[in-house]
Each structure stands twice: as C-alpha cells, then as structure tokens.
C-alpha cells in the first residue's frame, strides 16, 4: 500500500503535535517532517518531497500564503493544504490563488482533516464545509444583486448536459454538499458509508464536468438545482 507522505508546517507546537497525532492513526499516512515557520518550509519540502504539505496561514517571517506560493512554483508535485482560523472569503480566495489545493479551518474535526488529505493527495481540491457554505452564500448574494462574482472571466464551466443525468441519490448528495456537509455528515444523514459518498461525489463531478465540490455547488446554485437552506 502506497503511503501518503506529509509535512506539517505550523508555529504552534501543541497544535502541530495534535495534527500529527490524528494523521498517525491513518495507516496510509506518514508524517515525514515538521517545521515551525514558512521560511523553513521550502528547505523541508526540498529534502523530503512530500505528497501533501499542511501549512498554517499565520506564521512569523514568511506567512503560509507566501510559503505556499513559493512551494507551488518550486515543487508543484507537493500539494498544499492551508490551515487557518479565518473563514472570510478574501482569505480563502487569496490562498487558493497562490495554488493551495485545500483550505481547512482549525476548528476542523479529525475526520475532516483525514478526508481533506486523502482528496488532495489524489489530485482533488478540498475546502472546509463551513468555508464552502460561506463562499456559496457570497456567490448567491452577488448573483441575486446582479453583480458578477467573476467579472473578468467565467471560472465555473457551464453545464451542457441536463441535471436529470444525476441519479436521485446523487441529487441528494449534491444538495448536502450545498448545505456544507462533509462526507461523513452526508453518510450519516443518508445512512451510507463514507466510501459510497465519495463514489457519489466522483460521479457528480464527472457528470457535471467540474473539477471539485465547490464548483459543483456553485454551478448547481446558478442553475437552480439546489436550495440554499
């Protein structure tokens, strides 16, 4: 079984140790190194070439966003997940623009952390459910006010195929993604396993011709396929 090699960069030792402890419980994960500032991140990644870097956004010297930008340019094979206490849209979009593949709030639970690392390691993107919900609400607010959320270009692809290509279960999962639920939360609500939820999400992304969960939700809202609750 191939291991997912992980580096943790966070200037708070207790939090860093807590994250490592959670990841150590997952047999397919291996934390290969830790660091406590953004300036150190590049040296660590150059040496270990991890699959995933978990990066705190607020650190002395070089902050997490600047460190992420540097890592993406120098070591694009190492995918970065940002850790933050901020759920504001500006923080999230700034982090994603630098090339981060994930954005987690530090209030996350263990299941969300593990799920995010798995998704990002497999080449996907992951946003904390609360962040997804906030971004969707902001997009909806801009849409209803007649202001374009992306005036320069269309970020989210238009759907050329009708929604009825989704099964009823996939429609239920799509609605719960819009509600900001994690895979675990969806599974508990529908009484199905997290693995089954992941399969449904993968099918939804493929059928909707989008890259990640956030795009799927935003496109669904634009087309009136889900309710904002």
UniProtKB/Swiss-Prot annotation:
Induction (record text): Phosphorylated DegU activates its own expression.
Transcription regulation in keyword set: yes
Activity regulation description: Phosphorylated and unphosphorylated forms are both active and have different functions. A low concentration of phospho-DegU is sufficient to activate transcription of flagellar genes, but a higher concentration of phospho-DegU is required for transcription of other genes. Phosphorylated DegU is stabilized by DegR.
Post-translational modification: Phosphorylated and dephosphorylated by DegS.
Recorded GO CC terms: cytoplasm
Keyword hit for Nucleus: no
Gene Ontology MF annotations: DNA binding
Designated name of the protein: Transcriptional regulatory protein DegU
Lineage: Bacteria, Bacillati, Bacillota, Bacilli, Bacillales
Chain's gene name: degU
